[in-house]
Amino acid sequence: MAGHSKWANTKHRKAAQDAKRGKIFTKIIRELVTAARLGGGDPASNPRLRAAIDKALSNNMTRDTLNRAIARGVGSDEADNMETIIYEGYGPGGTAVMVECLSDNRNRTVSDVRHAFTKTGGNLGTDGSVAYLFAKKGVISYAPGLDEDAVMEAALEAGADDVETYDDGAIDVYTTPETFGDVKDALDAAGFVAESAEVSMIPSTKAELDAETAPKLLRLIDMLEDSDDVQEVYHNGEISDEIAALL
């Protein structure tokens, strides 16, 4: 299936995201520690840990760093007070937004999240207000330049649910959360190096943003990601190439 890839929507934010790499590493390490503490240090029997490892490697974290984080999780109780919290709300332009947090203080976290929504013209909703618009899936993304047919054949043979190809040559492979690790292993073994790989919340519908609402949504995302407690921000906003070029 051909279409418009997320590359155009994300490339203009790359410099800002690179500047946050230290914060990203801190969040990934927190997730590695928590996943190892709750489910053990073997990724083969701990899907949450496997997903965290894939995310760490996609962000160029060294094996040494991630192994130390796993060892910390297995050998300590520092993750005992951590809990995963999902907040839902509506952002600028009526976009549906889900915020995945890992926190030891709910009051602090909800205050940070609510502040970000309020400052950008959105509002924090109740449980279930937008969750029905998203599905949890594994997403393995490839940069333009690979043989699309070969990736598709290998992915479907490995058990992927769907493969989406885009006009610019980028490829997204979709899996269930349960088959994510096996499919990625098979694609790695076939020589296809992913640009990113993670279990994500994928929107079923998109909200097209205009020149006024697009920067507001990006500001909301940036404010949320600035919170140490926020691990992931999912949304259904879509920004056209023309508007992205202006941002």
Swiss-Prot record:
One of its GO terms (cellular component) is cytosol. It is found in: Cytoplasm. One of its GO terms (biological process) is regulation of DNA-templated transcription. The keyword Transcription applies. Gene3D superfamilies: 1.10.10.200, 3.30.70.980. InterPro entries: Integrase-like_N, TACO1_YebC-like_2nd/3rd_dom, TACO1_YebC_N, Transcrip_reg_TACO1-like, Transcrip_reg_TACO1-like_dom3, YebC-like. Keywords: Cytoplasm, DNA-binding, Transcription, Transcription regulation. GO terms for molecular function: DNA binding. SUPFAM superfamilies: YebC-like. HAMAP family: Transcrip_reg_TACO1. Belongs to the TACO1 family. NCBIfam families: PRK00110.1 (NF001030), PRK12378.1 (NF009044), YebC/PmpR family DNA-binding transcriptional regulator (TIGR01033). This is Probable transcriptional regulatory protein plu2109. It comes from Photorhabdus laumondii subsp. laumondii (strain DSM 15139 / CIP 105565 / TT01) (Photorhabdus luminescens subsp. laumondii).
